[in-house]
């Protein structure tokens, strides 16, 4: 997801999305270990999505406007 799309979500929606992305990342890592993962870029994309969500939550916490 793009940061602009994430900024339109509420904090509660962002927290739910963050938990979902963390579960997805865990599943991708398990698939990688088991040799079932075919698209390795999904791991890095998911990690970047998690970072974007955390950044937006932190910006809101600090009151930074973008």
From Swiss-Prot:
CDD domains linked to this entry: Ribosomal_L29_HIP
Membrane-spanning ranges: none
Gene3D superfamilies in alphabetical order: 1.10.287.310
CC per GO annotation: cytosolic large ribosomal subunit
Keywords: Ribonucleoprotein, Ribosomal protein
Listed GO biological process terms: translation
Top-level taxon: Bacteria
Record-level Gene Ontology MF annotations: structural constituent of ribosome
Xref: Pfam families: Ribosomal_L29 (PF00831)
Keyword Lipid metabolism attached: no
Protein family membership: Belongs to the universal ribosomal protein uL29 family.
Protein's UniProt name: Large ribosomal subunit protein uL29
Gene for this chain: rpmC
């Amino acid at each position: 997801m793009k940061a602009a799309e994430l900024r339109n979500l509420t904090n509660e929606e962002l927290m739910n999305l963050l938990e979902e992305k963390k579960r997805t990342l865990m599943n991708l890592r398990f698939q990688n270990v088991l040799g079932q993962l075919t698209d390795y870029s999904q791991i890095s994309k998911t990690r970047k999505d998690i970072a974007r969500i955390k950044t937006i939550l932190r910006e809101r916490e600090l009151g930074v406007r973008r």
